[in-house]
Amino acid sequence: MSLSFSLLKPPLSSSNPNPFLHGTTTKLSLLPSFSALSLSSSPPSSSTTYTFPVIKAMRSMQGKVICATNDKTVNVEVVRLAPHPKYKRRVRKKKKYQAHDPDNQFKVGDWVQLDKCRPISKTKTFLAVAPEGRQSSATRPKPIQAASDELGIPLESQVEGDKTV
């Protein structure tokens, strides 16, 4: 007998029978005891420690910034692989999302991670953050200009009019 059925069924032996099926005469003593499941105010014993895993309902998406002209908004293209309904081959599917960029730190071509947040506007429900593994253009170090002597061959601009005709 399930718990929901026992709650919906009227008690068999009642001193005050009620003609209604779902009357208000249900006594707390007739309900099953949940003392084993309820949380008590006393701390649990040291032998039993309860750790609940953090449940993240939606995995965060990663994509590439394709437009950053709007203020505090970036347009991100997310590419995912999904099976084709008929041919069962994995096909790339692209979708564009508007994401909130409060500091205008992302430029076109940067990889960002989209985290779900409260709706900021009609189309913006994601927050753009820098992923841990990748570097954005703001945090990427500038490449060092290579010296022209690296090849060992002087450039034409470095040769001083040493031309023979």
Curated annotation (Swiss-Prot):
Keywords, ordered alphabetically: Chloroplast, Plastid, Ribonucleoprotein, Ribosomal protein, RNA-binding, rRNA-binding, Transit peptide
Cystines in this chain: none
Disordered: annotated span: 128-165
Signal peptide residues on this chain, from the entry's feature table: none
Gene3D superfamilies: Nucleic acid-binding proteins
Molecular functions per Gene Ontology: rRNA binding; structural constituent of ribosome
Transmembrane segment boundaries: none
Predominant location: plastid
Presequence range in chain numbering: 1-57
Location(s), subcellular: Plastid, Chloroplast
GO biological process: translation
Record Pfam families: Ribosomal_S17 (PF00366)
Functional note: Component of the chloroplast ribosome (chloro-ribosome), a dedicated translation machinery responsible for the synthesis of chloroplast genome-encoded proteins, including proteins of the transcription and translation machinery and components of the photosynthetic apparatus.
Description of how the protein assembles with itself and partners: Component of the chloroplast small ribosomal subunit (SSU). Mature 70S chloroplast ribosomes of higher plants consist of a small (30S) and a large (50S) subunit. The 30S small subunit contains 1 molecule of ribosomal RNA (16S rRNA) and 24 different proteins. The 50S large subunit contains 3 rRNA molecules (23S, 5S and 4.5S rRNA) and 33 different proteins.
Family: Belongs to the universal ribosomal protein uS17 family.
HAMAP family according to UniProt: Ribosomal_uS17_B
Protein name in the entry: Small ribosomal subunit protein uS17c
Organism of provenance: Spinacia oleracea
